[in-house]
Amino acid sequence: MMLLEEPGALMASPEPVAADPTRRERVVVAVVAVAVVGIYVAIAAAHGALGASRNDDWAYIRIVKDLADTGEFRLDGWVAAMFLGQALVSLPVMALFGQGILPLQMMVAVFAAVGLWATYAVVRPWLDRRWTALSVACLAAGPVYGIVAVSYMTDVPSYALQMITLLVGIRAMRSAPVHLGWLAGALGFGIASFSMREFGVASGAVVAVYAVAQAWAGRQRLRPVLALVGAWSVGVMALYFWRSNLPNTWPMVVDVSPGGLGSAANSIWRSALTIGLLASPVAFAVSPVRLLRAMGQRLTRRAQVVLLLLAITALATIPFHGLGLIGNHADRELAYWGTLPGDPPSLLPTPVWVLVLLVALYSTAVSVGLVALRVEAVLRRRRSWRSGLASTADRGAHLVVSFVVLYAALLVATVVITPTELFDRYLLVLVPLSAALLARAGRAEQVMRSLPGRREWAALLALATLGVAAIDASAAFDGAKWRLGEVVEARTGWDPGSIDAGYEWYGYHQTAPVERQGFLTAPNFWRLLFAPRPVCATGSFAPSDQSAVPADDVIATVVERSLFGVEVRLVATPGPDDCP
């Protein structure tokens, strides 16, 4: 119970300037959140990506359309996420606006704005207004959120509901005894988040455990709290086992082989670097000299040896030659570049990419140092968990610390035990909350300034520049792929399902069920998701030497340029099958 014992110490602030957001502040944040998401939507619309299938959109849309038409929730063998909750929320949207892609993407955009607003509301009661804004901006300005916010992926809706779960849960815990109505609401939102993505269970679990601990410590309303938590637990388990036993469920495989563990370690390291990069505007506020001095003075010899061994192990085992981020969105190339064969254009030149990695390394190292200092502070105090719960009003920070630890532990356990591949979109919830906790911890250790200054806002501007470049280039790529398929269809009259204009186009236009044909190997792995059928045209990145593809062999060429000059040039050629 040590985690529950001292999260207050972990978050203690020498300058208690945090407060609940005022009504005006809430309205301003809501307006800003809507404006930010509006920019994401405008960028996608400018390149034709709004209303086009993006990444796994096609697979989710096939399921929800089938649900709307038949009333049955049937999996296709490709979707691994829980998805049920998002499908149910989508039904009224489809009833009002039709079964097109655009209404569903706009629904997710609404979730994106709500998620930013809720995150601010979660952090603000225990952090200064400026640090809160900077922490949320680390996610909003980065290269990940703006891409998945204009899609039909489950990541953003699950993120938004997890933030709402924490927000309502904090409201329940701040009253003494625990407010049963708010607790029931928080657990309900927790189940809703879990019903979209399995990792969403973390928010409800943290609220449930903390509610029981608080009721036990105060010896008030323990039985009704246990009843609510028990009902939540039964609901989560019933939903999980029901979903796991549906036909065409993605198989769960256990892999603890040396190769699997090595891959897991690489994924964990890359994920840490990705979070470090996105939280770097806060990390730059930390004085490295003060941090090193504090670590030398306050850490025990044992802790210093552990950190030294950790650094040596990292240097000895991490393949720095291939060092990078976890990928999928924040990458040197275009987001989802593997969804079309050929050589994609680079988003960032080599010197800029090296600088990005150095920033990520620095920020991650600073974060590790701060975590070590705060853990040491927790261990020094050694107060009982009962007194810790009873003596502090900083329960929002308690929940957030516990949530971040649990969510990260779930990610680590999943990637260690199973061959699940991590992507940066799985880290959404960790970015703003980790940044906020770093700000709080840095001020508690007196190794950073009390308020963000020019350096931190300049770092945020640099992150936003990287974010806009990635979001814009991704929209250009997705829009170009979709337009390539449309042009080929218009010029040839071929069935759209016989045109391979990339992963999204091909999957969306198939009418046959998913029938995986062995190992999915690139390029064009998406064809192996379905039974063999004639493919009349194939899209790809245009080769740098345009003479490599004779003009007579080109059915269509689509060129899209991003705001920062990245040129996406795609070509479609006949075949591999002959079609009339």
Regions found by a protein language model. Name each.
Residues 106-127, 164-168:
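Transmembrane-helix motifs of polytopic, lipid-linked glycan transferases
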